[in-house]
């Protein structure tokens, strides 16, 4: 059987990006050996390193490399070295936001779960964290109050005011809702749509459209929940949730809360998709310049981002599951990097990558 070859644009970026990306490469190498898949990988500069080498955070050559690929595996960008630059020229705002805009990445997927054996890291009460949870936040990325017009400031003195506008179109709600329901079909078949329909006109439309989309998914249960209640329920009993469907601003809040209650930010992957299932896959955490180059960073988020890439952009579900199973096996065996090991011996970044790749090869 001939191997199917996928073209991947690899953008390691700054800080810990290159060293955790190296571990993702090891895991993809193992996947090539175990499954009938090959990866053609091309590396490109992005963020601070691109500023140093090309004079801007997102060179034209990097954009072209991404355009010619099936998916983008992204590391992390930013660091103190570039903080003096104007905001739009800094690595974060000058690279990630233009990439999202260029590829019309309207959907952000943020999985959050407590892995077996890591319940103690959650800030939640033990009886809650021990029940575990496995949530995917599906966040609309390009609409809502962050981008709505008009926005601005005017006036002075006591009459000075500032304003933003929350706008959602029917088509924007429909397409994000469909992704949430499709995701739920692969999971526990429950969608929780988060809104503020008791106050906001945009949320009333959101709820109406989500209910219409739900009719096409009779096998999936739809639940509506107000944003204020949802933030409380995540603390009280996160195990009740499966897929959480959110607008841009509500998804921003909910996905960060989900990340915090896992207790291990270095474990959380993220995906941003467009309507063609082309995606950018990255760890949810930052570039951690304080630990860069020390071989102690946790590579799991980068490795799990590669699993999401296999699932959502490449349609290789079996390969995605084999990565996730290998990660779970390593963690439940107590093989942990310094951020999680506590007073036990810790694995280095590279040793963790080796271990997960080994579990894939031996599965």
Swiss-Prot record:
<dbReference type="Pfam" id="PF00180">
    <property type="entry name" value="Iso_dh"/>
</dbReference>
<dbReference type="GO" id="GO:0009098">
    <property type="term" value="P:L-leucine biosynthetic process"/>
</dbReference>
<feature type="binding site">
    <location>
        <position position="252"/>
    </location>
    <ligand>
        <name>Mg(2+)</name>
    </ligand>
</feature>
<feature type="binding site">
    <location>
        <position position="228"/>
    </location>
    <ligand>
        <name>Mg(2+)</name>
    </ligand>
</feature>
<feature type="site" description="Important for catalysis">
    <location>
        <position position="196"/>
    </location>
</feature>
<comment type="similarity">
    <text>Belongs to the isocitrate and isopropylmalate dehydrogenases family. LeuB type 1 subfamily.</text>
</comment>
<keyword id="KW-0028">Amino-acid biosynthesis</keyword>
<comment type="function">
    <text>Catalyzes the oxidation of 3-carboxy-2-hydroxy-4-methylpentanoate (3-isopropylmalate) to 3-carboxy-4-methyl-2-oxopentanoate. The product decarboxylates to 4-methyl-2 oxopentanoate.</text>
</comment>
<keyword id="KW-0963">Cytoplasm</keyword>
<dbReference type="InterPro" id="IPR024084">
    <property type="entry name" value="IsoPropMal-DH-like_dom"/>
</dbReference>
<protein>
    <recommendedName>
        <fullName>3-isopropylmalate dehydrogenase</fullName>
        <ecNumber>1.1.1.85</ecNumber>
    </recommendedName>
</protein>
<dbReference type="GO" id="GO:0005829">
    <property type="term" value="C:cytosol"/>
</dbReference>
<feature type="binding site">
    <location>
        <begin position="286"/>
        <end position="298"/>
    </location>
    <ligand>
        <name>NAD(+)</name>
    </ligand>
</feature>
<keyword id="KW-0460">Magnesium</keyword>
<keyword id="KW-0520">NAD</keyword>
<feature type="binding site">
    <location>
        <position position="228"/>
    </location>
    <ligand>
        <name>substrate</name>
    </ligand>
</feature>
<dbReference type="GO" id="GO:0051287">
    <property type="term" value="F:NAD binding"/>
</dbReference>
<feature type="binding site">
    <location>
        <position position="110"/>
    </location>
    <ligand>
        <name>substrate</name>
    </ligand>
</feature>
<feature type="binding site">
    <location>
        <begin position="79"/>
        <end position="92"/>
    </location>
    <ligand>
        <name>NAD(+)</name>
    </ligand>
</feature>
<feature type="binding site">
    <location>
        <position position="256"/>
    </location>
    <ligand>
        <name>Mg(2+)</name>
    </ligand>
</feature>
<dbReference type="GO" id="GO:0000287">
    <property type="term" value="F:magnesium ion binding"/>
</dbReference>
<comment type="subunit">
    <text>Homodimer.</text>
</comment>
<keyword id="KW-0464">Manganese</keyword>
<dbReference type="GO" id="GO:0003862">
    <property type="term" value="F:3-isopropylmalate dehydrogenase activity"/>
</dbReference>
<keyword id="KW-0479">Metal-binding</keyword>
<feature type="binding site">
    <location>
        <position position="100"/>
    </location>
    <ligand>
        <name>substrate</name>
    </ligand>
</feature>
<keyword id="KW-0100">Branched-chain amino acid biosynthesis</keyword>
<comment type="pathway">
    <text>Amino-acid biosynthesis; L-leucine biosynthesis; L-leucine from 3-methyl-2-oxobutanoate: step 3/4.</text>
</comment>
<keyword id="KW-0432">Leucine biosynthesis</keyword>
<feature type="binding site">
    <location>
        <position position="139"/>
    </location>
    <ligand>
        <name>substrate</name>
    </ligand>
</feature>
<dbReference type="InterPro" id="IPR019818">
    <property type="entry name" value="IsoCit/isopropylmalate_DH_CS"/>
</dbReference>
<feature type="site" description="Important for catalysis">
    <location>
        <position position="146"/>
    </location>
</feature>
<dbReference type="InterPro" id="IPR004429">
    <property type="entry name" value="Isopropylmalate_DH"/>
</dbReference>
<keyword id="KW-0560">Oxidoreductase</keyword>
């Amino acid at each position: 059987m001939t191997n199917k070859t996928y073209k991947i644009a690899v953008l390691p970026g700054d800080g810990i990006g290159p060293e955790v990306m190296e571990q993702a490469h090891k895991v993809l190498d193992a996947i090539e050996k175990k499954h009938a898949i090959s990866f053609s990988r091309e590396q490109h500069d992005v963020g601070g390193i691109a500023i140093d080498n090309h004079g801007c955070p997102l060179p034209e050559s990097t954009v072209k490399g991404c355009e010619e690929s099936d998916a983008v595996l992204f590391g992390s960008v930013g660091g103190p070295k570039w903080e003096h630059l104007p905001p739009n020229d800094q690595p974060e705002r000058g690279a990630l936001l233009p990439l999202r805009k260029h590829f019309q990445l309207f959907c952000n997927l943020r999985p959050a779960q407590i892995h077996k054996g890591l319940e103690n890291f959650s800030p939640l009460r033990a009886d809650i964290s021990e029940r575990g949870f496995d949530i995917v936040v599906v966040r609309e990325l390009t609409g809502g109050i962050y981008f709505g017009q008009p926005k601005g400031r005017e006036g002075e003195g006591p009459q000075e005011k500032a304003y933003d506008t929350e706008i959602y179109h029917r088509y924007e709600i429909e397409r994000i809702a469909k992704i949430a329901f499709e995701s739920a079909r692969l999971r526990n078949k429950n969608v929780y749509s988060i809104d503020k329909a008791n106050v906001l006109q945009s949320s009333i439309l959101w709820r109406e459209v989500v209910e219409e989309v739900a009719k096409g998914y009779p096998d999936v249960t739809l639940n509506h929940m107000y944003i204020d209640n949802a933030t409380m329920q995540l603390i009280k009993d996160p195990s009740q949730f499966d897929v959480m469907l959110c607008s841009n601003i509500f998804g921003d809040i909910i996905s960060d809360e989900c990340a915090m209650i896992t207790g291990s930010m270095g474990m959380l992957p993220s995906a941003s998709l467009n309507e063609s299932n082309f995606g950018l896959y990255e760890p949810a955490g930052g570039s951690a310049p304080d630990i860069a180059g020390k071989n102690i960073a946790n590579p799991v988020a980068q490795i799990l981002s590669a699993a999401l890439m296999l699932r959502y952009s490449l349609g290789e579900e079996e390969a995605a599951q084999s990565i996730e199973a290998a990660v779970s096996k390593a963690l439940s065996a107590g093989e942990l990097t310094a951020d999680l090991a506590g007073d036990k011996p810790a694995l280095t970044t590279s040793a963790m990558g080796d271990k997960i790749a080994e579990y894939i090869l031996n599965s």
